[in-house]
Amino acid sequence: MSDADSLSCSLTLESDEYDEEEYDTNLSKLLENKTLNWIFVGGKGGVGKTTTSCSIAVQLAKRRESVLLLSTDPAHNTSDAFNQKFTNQPTLINSFDNLYCMEIDTTYSENTAFKLNKTEFFDNIIPELLQSFPGIDEALCFAELMQSIKNMKYSVIVFDTAPTGHTLRLLAFPELLKKALGYLINLREKLKGTLNMLKSFTNNEMELEGIYEKINHLNAMSISIQSNFQNPLKTTFVCVCIPEFLSVYETERLIQELTKKNISCYNIVVNQVVFPLDSMTVDVAHCEGLLKQIKDKQVQESFSSLVQKTKELEDVYISRRKLQSKYLTQIKNLYGNDFHIVCMPQLKSEIRGLQNISNFSEMLLESKEIPIYR
């Protein structure tokens, strides 16, 4: 059975067990939670993660003493969102005195601002470690990054993450570090006698002790980071999606992985939702009656063309609503009992600039019924 078929089956099964009792359909509880230190915002590419994370940060700035919006997405759309250039250093966002933003690269690089203080001996160990634990280079860089972030004195940090696959790797780094560093610590114990003998023949005793100290420090750091990740009072994840198959599928995959890693997740933001209009249908019979009353042929043709175009637009609108309703129903059935599901409307233009972000952020506080087409 394919992954798509599996998801379809799970959706059908969940639908039969759906209870009408639901969580609030806004982010008020998230924003009012004073214990949270880290809020991760993630999902499939192109679903509005940056807009959502920026909006959450703007609302938090009204409630918390100091807020940092941190982009770990290589695309770094936060600068475009606020029309302001950000770097790998916290920069105050225009018009705020307590909201900062920074854009960092979580991939391993000699040029990264958060790199390990390496030695020649450490350089010799790393290649062996890389072969045994692929991805440990990025994990080490991530550990240094998270430790630096942890030492920053912000009330809360909002992470604008990369698309799902990259984010899942990022969240797996603490466990990878724990395994790799545990391997090194065990190796040290096994080779303790040999290493002590080597000390008497070399001048590297201080260097060896420095490396062991660094490894123990990194191990303690990875345990601390993992503990923070798994503490629902300190860390939570906000999933962002749109009502389309691939996005809903990736959201399910993301939530399953977060559950496996014991990371709290109880909010889903569904963007680009087409809500019902006040009047959804064109009264064709009435329009045809009006058409017969028009004597001027040119006006009659123009009116007829207008009615036809309106009808075509209505057909597209209804088709779009029906398609979205299929996935909104699945989202409701899968997550309605355990998540705050916030539906955000399809807007006329992209969200750029502080005013537009602020307007969007206010909508996150509004309770809106999930618009299922009947």
Swiss-Prot record:
Where does the protein principally reside?
cytoplasm
- What do the Gene Ontology cellular component annotations say? GET complex
E.C. number: 3.6.-.-
GO molecular function terms listed in the Swiss-Prot or TrEMBL record:
ATP binding; ATP hydrolysis activity
**Gene3D superfamilies recorded:** P-loop containing nucleotide triphosphate hydrolases
Q: What is the uppermost EC class here?
A: hydrolase
Highest taxon in the source lineage: Eukaryota
In the record, the note on similarity to other proteins reads: Belongs to the arsA ATPase family.
Q: What does this protein do?
A: ATPase required for the post-translational delivery of tail-anchored (TA) proteins to the endoplasmic reticulum. Recognizes and selectively binds the transmembrane domain of TA proteins in the cytosol. This complex then targets to the endoplasmic reticulum by membrane-bound receptors, where the tail-anchored protein is released for insertion. This process is regulated by ATP binding and hydrolysis. ATP binding drives the homodimer towards the closed dimer state, facilitating recognition of newly synthesized TA membrane proteins. ATP hydrolysis is required for insertion.
The name on file for this protein is: ATPase ASNA1 homolog
Lineage, uppermost ranks: Eukaryota, Sar, Alveolata, Apicomplexa, Aconoidasida
